[in-house]
Amino acid sequence: MSRRATWLVSRPVEALRQIEEWPAEHVAAGLTSPTAVIAEQGDVGHRLGWGSVTKLLTAYATLIAAEEGALDLDEPAGPEGSTVRHLLAHASGLAWDSPAPLGRPGERRIYSNTGYVVLADHLARRTEMPFGEYLRVGVLEPLGLGATLEGDAAGGIVGTLGDMLAFGREALAPTLIAPETLTEATTVQFPGLEGVLPGFGRQTPNDWGLGFELRSGKSPHWTGTRNSHRTYGHFGSKPGTATFVWIDPERQLAAAAVADASFGGWAAAGWPTLSDALLEEVQQ
């Protein structure tokens, strides 16, 4: 049976057919409002690795722990002078994949997988629960996600497009954290820091919230030009998978896509094109 024959479309949104051209065997994309899926297409039930979209769930678990009083966002964590807030916002000074700091906290926006592993270890100590268990009972199960953590807190989630869209709905209209906590998480932390946005080069500034990457005025970027500057989310890239989820609070929409193909020029060009086409079509 051909891939096209197995695909599901919840309602006709022509823009979603762009994913047929992506260089992947299993690919899916969709759009949701705060309350329900608007459209989805592709291998929507296929599970694959989310890559760094995982960091949004790790950040959400941390925000829940902060609301519960298990930790404080401004308590020390990570290298000397760093806090939980620094780790969440890639401002701790830790390198991409090394425990050795590249700078002082609050000095530069250094995207760091290591920082999220350190954050998860800190969360586990403060909650007295293994990180994976806290994530499961605090985030995955309450949202009804079938996603599972099968690696580290920086990139180990495996799940479906539907799981990602469900998190997008949560990030539009939160049920697990207070609205004011989400507002703080989607507000730039340590304003003015420059840094490299992986795959898209140096950004000045490279705005980031608490886990959520902020679109702001970045160019080039993986979201579309029709996305509002208030858009937030994350993309993921690891060998054999490329994923994204964005949440646009001005449009009251979230979109996600998953593909079992490594990130490359097809994604850097195709994701913004898809995003713009979705926004143009759905909001006509």
Regions found by a protein language model. Give the residues of each.
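N-terminal core-entry segment
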Residues: E25, L31, R85, P101-L102
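Solvent-exposed loop/turn segments at secondary-structure junctions
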Residues: L94-A95, Y116, A261-F263
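Well-ordered alpha-helical segments within folded domains of soluble proteins
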Residues: L57-Y60, T114-A120, G162-A166
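Active-site helix/loop module of the DD-peptidase/beta-lactamase fold
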Residues: G49-V53, L57, A65-P101, Y111, ...
